[in-house]
């Protein structure tokens, strides 16, 4: 299934989530309820694992038989190797794979390096094309959409170390974050996830399984646009500019979660709208709590590097008094800036009083012309 995002692009609903919390804080509490949700997939996987084991045993006995083509195993073990990952991705035939890792180090081992691991995270979030080319006759050559749902956990120190080189490359913005606060060291009370719980959950799971095609929810689309603008304004007022670049994908994560709830319940509710607002704020709060200092330092280093070369003081100075968004996009391209940041830049300039919206585009304000009179 697919949804249409704020930028007009249609894509899928992969979930990449990382819980960052101290040791012994209860990060493993998701295991029991998620096992209930995945129960049907586990049963199918067990059948196919048995068939694969039988094929391997026959090969060891010298039988010349081809590997069965329909051996989809969707739930991968945390010690999965790179070769096994590529094989399972090829076997899945378009179905989503699921991985649950108790520590990020497992992702590094599977990928072969931190750089490769972060690349997988980025591609998985975007449901982008992934693959490898191999020359061996028995090696897997695959190139397909990377459909992967990943849930992992780690400690704050390990997370900061793992993503130290990926602060500004788009990896962090693509990860849904959570944490566990327990300052009073209260002993957790765990739920009971038995057959009764499975029966209560079954209608929601069935609705999700039956969803397909392009999913539309006008209420969610309208709500997320308002939440994005509100978050950007709030960060500007609070002096948290270092988080501004994280608003867009944090809103995508909140939107995906809301759509999943919408599909599971079969209707749009006030509770889902409230959850969407909370999720966006929570993503930014955890990002700042865990990676805030790291992000600030990376931004300062990037700004220091930019000051070493001539820069345009204000991108609007090159534009006519009235222009359209496409005009600014072309200017962004000419000065080497990312076109994807145009919408955010325009919203910021309107918020700062430098631009006003017109019927067909934007117009510079008198305030802007007075402030930058010597540059226009």
Locations of regions flagged by a protein language model:
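Phosphate-handling catalytic cores of nucleic-acid transaction enzymes
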Residues: 1-376
């Amino acid at each position: 299934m697919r949804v249409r995002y704020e930028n007009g692009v249609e894509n899928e609903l992969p979930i990449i989530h990382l819980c960052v919390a101290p040791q012994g804080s209860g990060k493993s509490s998701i295991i029991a309820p998620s096992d209930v949700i995945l129960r049907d997939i586990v049963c199918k996987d067990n059948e196919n694992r048995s068939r694969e084991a039988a094929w391997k045993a026959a090969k060891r006995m010298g039988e010349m038989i081809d590997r069965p083509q329909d051996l989809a195993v969707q739930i991968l073990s945390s010690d999965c190797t790179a070769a096994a990952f590529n094989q399972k991705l090829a076997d899945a035939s378009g179905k989503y794979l699921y991985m649950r890792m108790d520590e990020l180090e497992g992702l590094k081992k599977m990928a072969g390096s931190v750089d490769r691991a972060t690349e997988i995270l980025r591609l998985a979030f975007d449901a982008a094309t992934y693959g490898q080319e191999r020359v061996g006759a028995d090696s897997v050559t695959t190139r397909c959409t990377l459909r992967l749902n990943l849930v992992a956990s780690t400690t704050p120190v390990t997370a900061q170390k793992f993503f130290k080189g990926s602060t500004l490359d788009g990896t962090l913005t693509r990860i849904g974050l959570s944490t566990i606060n327990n300052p009073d060291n209260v002993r957790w009370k765990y739920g009971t996830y038995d057959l009764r719980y499975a029966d209560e959950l079954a209608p929601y799971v069935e609705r999700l399984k039956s969803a397909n095609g392009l999913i539309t929810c006008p209420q969610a689309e309208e709500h997320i646009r308002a939440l994005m603008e509100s978050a950007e304004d709030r960060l500007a007022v609070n002096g948290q500019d270092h988080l501004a670049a994280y608003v867009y994908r944090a809103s995508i994560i909140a939107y995906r979660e809301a759509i999943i709830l919408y599909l599971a319940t079969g209707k749009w509710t006030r509770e889902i709208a409230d959850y969407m607002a909370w999720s966006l704020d929570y993503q930014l709060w955890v990002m700042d709590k865990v990676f805030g200092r790291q992000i600030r330092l990376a931004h300062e280093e990037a700004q220091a590097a930019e000051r070493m070369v001539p820069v345009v003081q204000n991108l609007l100075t090159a534009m006519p008094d009235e222009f359209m968004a496409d005009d600014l996009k072309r200017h962004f391209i000419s000065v080497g800036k990312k076109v994807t940041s145009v919408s955010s830049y325009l919203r910021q300039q309107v918020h700062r009083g430098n631009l006003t919206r017109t019927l067909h585009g934007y117009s510079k304000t008198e305030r802007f012309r007075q402030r930058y009179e010597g540059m226009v």
